Design a protein with these regions (language model features):
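Glycine-rich beta-strand-centered segment in the early N-terminal region that forms part
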Residues: 26-42, 54-96, 125
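NAD(P)H dinucleotide-binding glycine-rich loop of Rossmann-like/cofactor-binding domains
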Residues: 90-155, 165
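N-terminal Rossmann-fold NAD(P) dinucleotide-binding loop
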Residues: 161-162
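Aromatic pocket-lining residues of Rossmann-like dinucleotide-binding sites
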Residues: 168
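NAD(P)-binding Rossmann-fold cofactor-contacting core
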Residues: 171-189
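Glycine-rich cofactor phosphate-binding loops and adjacent beta1-alpha1 units
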Residues: 185, 189-253
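C-terminal substrate-binding/catalytic core of Rossmann-like NAD(P)-dependent dehydrogenases/reductases
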Residues: 236-284
């Protein structure tokens, strides 16, 4: 096959320096698909750290880079062993097809070349809301492991916090959500969003933090019921510490929820396409 294409891509050259560049894409193989991107989302959490230069270093990190881990588009060309056909709409969780420019995460481009195993077909009726599959899969992953419980308290009512709450409601829970910004306390269905200062309960068995605030751990431990669990599901740009005595007295468990897995993506695709999980009202 060995066809090559070019694309316009958003490139972060360095912190706080962004350009639109023409980039040569990797050659297309028999197991790849070429996707013309229709919509791509911007993460105001993780990708803001990339923009500001505050993203902690991890493998694959570096500049220049193409951001974007939540894109939707139509297949322009499909490799003979890809299992897809031109014209199919797919979700693309990023791409690494830009040569020396790092694909972290690689979806903010007019066209991408990506292994077919990385994409997933989406129902065209979802439209641009399908870019939320990555965040929805992240939300699903928080409580997908064996023995995990749906949250009683969620910290933060951004898009990820709302999706975690919606999934909890589907599972029969009615979580409380703490949100310090009064403008973000709207839009709750089946759960309550409050100012943390107004919370009278203060003892929760399962707490999920998606605020990204590395200084909150002691506060969360003070609100934990004995034997309870705190799940860190945000991304933190500073070290996290806590006072040991109160964690000891509560026999606290602290867990990190990392990146979603393919089974999480499939689960939220089924929930969204069946209409059980609403993705409405989340894109700003």
């Amino acid at each position: 096959m060995n066809t090559t294409y070019q694309a316009k891509a958003v490139v972060l050259e360095k912190p706080e320096s962004i350009v639109l560049s023409d980039l040569q894409l990797s050659p297309v193989t028999e197991t790849d698909v070429v996707v013309d991107i229709e919509w791509s989302g911007i993460s105001t959490g993780t990708e803001k750290l990339l923009w500001s230069g505050r993203m902690p270093h991890f493998p694959g990190m570096g500049y220049p880079l193409v951001p974007g881990y939540e894109s939707v588009g139509k297949i322009y060309q499909a490799g003979i062993r890809s299992g897809y056909k031109p014209g199919q709409r797919v979700f693309v969780p990023g791409a690494r097809c830009f040569g020396d420019v790092k694909g972290l995460f690689g979806g903010a481009a007019s066209r991408v070349v990506v292994p077919a195993s990385r994409v997933i077909g989406v129902d065209s009726k979802l439209g641009p809301e399908a870019v939320l599959f990555a965040l929805a899969a992240t939300a699903h992953h928080v409580t997908a492991s064996e023995g995990s419980q749906q949250p009683d308290l969620i910290i933060g009512h951004g898009v990820l916090g709302r999706l975690i709450a919606r999934i909890a409601v589907l599972a029969g829970k009615s979580p409380v959500v703490w949100e310090v910004d009064a403008d973000r306390r709207t839009g709750a269905i089946g759960y309550e969003v409050i100012d943390p200062k107004a919370d009278q309960k203060r003892y929760y068995k399962t707490i999920v933090d998606v605020s990204g605030d590395a200084s909150l751990l002691d506060t969360l431990i003070s609100c934990l019921a004995p034997g309870g669990e705190i799940v860190l599901a945000g991304f933190y740009d500073a070290p996290m510490t806590f006072s040991f005595p109160q964690a000891f007295m509560r026999e606290a468990r602290i867990r990190v929820a990392a990146q979603w897995q393919p089974k999480d993506l499939l689960a939220v695709k089924n929930l969204a396409e069946s209409g059980r999980l609403s993705l409405d009202g989340l894109i700003t």
